[in-house]
């Protein structure tokens, strides 16, 4: 469905601006002030649209997955030969959606096709049953994704459908998060190596296909240019959107992504959000050997001399994809200077 910016599930607004990677941007502090509050971690209000929207739309999606799984449980493989594959697809979607929500809010109510059949059932579900920690949530998420790995085929004929590699990748990612145990202040206090080993199994199953089903593009830009949609080996799974499809909103799009561009007429009339931090820009610095400066990348300060700064230092070329820098090529066209 169409996702307006206030309801979008997008890492830039819920991840980058909450970290040291980016600033909110926009026309000022009052422009989407809820995101500013998240950036400075002050006066965060849970029921403001920009905060409540992703929660609401997340559970709208969860409700649909649960209805689909309940309906699938009522048919037989004989009557519906695709039952297993479709169940795997929905399990993946539910696991991936819960993963996103779990990383944002940590303690969330787990609602599934068994415990959330009625409004009353859902109302009575706690986000911390019996005061438990969040391990049980990770276990549910991983269980969904591992079931998807079991049920899904290696290849799907229809574009956009989830395959086994997508489930492997998502299961590995969830296990990696689960392995790093955190205390109440989100500090890592333990690393569970057995869980890391479980993640490594799925990772190896993907990387063992390098040169065949998966691999790196010869040109980094191919991951982002529209002519390569659904056609690169780097893409594990691509969400499908549509425009000019007859809907009242003009398309089924993730509107939050539309704010993620510099305000630059005539190319982008809006909206100048998601401004890269100096720390993030510095992270692209390299030594004379072209390798990252892991320990010293943030030692230099621009102090208003950005032109000299970029001339005097060397950077990973992917910086041009990530940031719009005045006087330098924008994205992948060397003749288009920002």
Show the residue positions of the predicted features:
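An aromatic- and glycine-enriched ligand-binding surface/loop that stacks and positions planar moieties
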Residues: 1-33, 108, 146-147, 161-168, ...
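Short coil/linker segments at helix-helix boundaries
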Residues: 107-135, 181-198
């Amino acid at each position: 469905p169409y996702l307006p910016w206030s309801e979008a599930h997008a890492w830039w607004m819920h991840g980058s601006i909450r970290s040291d990677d980016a600033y909110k941007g926009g026309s000022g502090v009052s422009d989407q002030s809820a995101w500013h509050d998240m950036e400075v971690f002050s006066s965060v209000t849970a029921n403001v649209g920009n905060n409540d929207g992703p929660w609401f739309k997340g559970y709208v999606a969860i409700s649909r997955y649960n209805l689909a799984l309940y309906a699938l449980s009522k048919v037989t493989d004989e009557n519906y030969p695709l039952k297993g594959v479709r169940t795997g697809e929905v399990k993946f979607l539910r696991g991936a959606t819960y993963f996103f929500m779990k990383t944002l809010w940590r303690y969330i109510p787990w609602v599934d096709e068994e415990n959330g059949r009625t409004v009353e059932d859902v109302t009575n579900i706690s986000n911390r049953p019996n005061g438990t920690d969040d391990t049980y949530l990770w276990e549910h998420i991983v269980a969904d994704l591992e079931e998807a790995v079991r049920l899904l085929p290696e290849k799907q004929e229809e574009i956009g459908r989830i395959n086994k590699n997508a489930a492997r990748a998502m299961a590995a990612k969830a296990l990696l998060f689960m392995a790093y145990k955190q205390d109440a202040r989100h500090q890592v206090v333990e690393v569970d190596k057995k869980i890391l080993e479980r993640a490594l199994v799925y990772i190896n199953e993907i990387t063992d296909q390098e040169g065949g089903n998966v691999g790196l593009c010869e040109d980094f830009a191919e991951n982002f240019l529209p002519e390569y949609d659904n056609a690169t080996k780097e893409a594990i799974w691509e969400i499908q959107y549509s425009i000019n499809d007859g809907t009242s909103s003009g398309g089924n799009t993730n509107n939050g992504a539309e704010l993620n561009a510099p305000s630059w007429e005539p190319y982008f009339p809006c909206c100048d959000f998601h401004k890269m931090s100096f720390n993030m820009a510095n992270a692209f610095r390299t030594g004379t050997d072209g390798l990252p400066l892991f320990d010293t990348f943030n030692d230099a300060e621009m102090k208003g001399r950005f032109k000299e700064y970029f001339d005097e230092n060397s950077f990973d070329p992917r910086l041009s994809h990530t940031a719009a820098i005045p006087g330098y090529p924008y994205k992948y066209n060397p003749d288009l200077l920002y």
